[in-house]
């Protein structure tokens, strides 16, 4: 279950503050939200996430991108809930809301989730192999991942 946290000052336009996959999740409660955009996706099992007073099931390859400071909590619904995740920062972090049409929550369906999971795995593998030395590569991959969320801004009807 690899997990990486940024260990250098932010100098790139977009950067992962943290990224990981194959993470065994028990649950988290964030009444003040998280300080950065936070993406959470189920790799296997099933979880339950509460955002803005609404409860959703998070099944395999489904995910949520949550804006900073949005209260939320999540917990496992199955015996084992395994996740991929990424949190985003960077010198252009303030431009992310405009990229996402100021949406505070974006639902990711299974098809898009498969692509995002593959991108997260590529980034995790790259960090494992080469560390965080190539900030341009990581920044480019971070931006590429953020672009996936712009494709999902209008999301399914139950999220409108």
Label every model-predicted segment.
Residues 91-108:
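Double-stranded beta-helix
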Residues 91, 111-160:
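An amphipathic alpha-helical interaction segment
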Residues 22-25, 90-94, 151:
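Active-site/binding-pocket entry motifs
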Residues 1-57, 62, 77-78, 103-107:
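Generic protein-terminus/edge-of-domain signal
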Residues 29, 49, 95-96, 157:
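Short acidic, gly/pro-rich beta-turn/loop elements at beta-sheet edges
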Residues 55, 68-92:
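Ligand-binding loop in jelly-roll beta-barrel domains
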């Amino acid at each position: 279950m690899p997990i990486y946290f940024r260990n250098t000052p932010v100098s790139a336009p977009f950067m992962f503050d943290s990224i990981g996959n194959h993470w065994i999740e028990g649950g988290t409660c964030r009444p003040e939200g998280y300080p950065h955009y936070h993406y959470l996706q189920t790799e296997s099992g099933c979880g339950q996430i509460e955002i803005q007073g609404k409860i959703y099931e998070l099944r395999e390859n489904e995910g949520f991108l949550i804006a900073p400071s949005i209260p939320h909590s999540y917990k496992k619904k199955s015996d084992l809930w395994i996740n991929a995740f990424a949190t985003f920062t960077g010198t252009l972090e303030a431009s992310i809301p405009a990229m996402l049409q100021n949406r505070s929550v974006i639902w990711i369906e299974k098809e898009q989730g498969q692509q995002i999971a593959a991108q997260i795995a590529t980034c995790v593998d790259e960090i494992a192999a080469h560390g965080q030395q190539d900030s341009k590569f990581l920044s480019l991959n971070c931006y590429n991942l953020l672009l996936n969320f712009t494709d999902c801004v209008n999301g399914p009807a139950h999220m409108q």
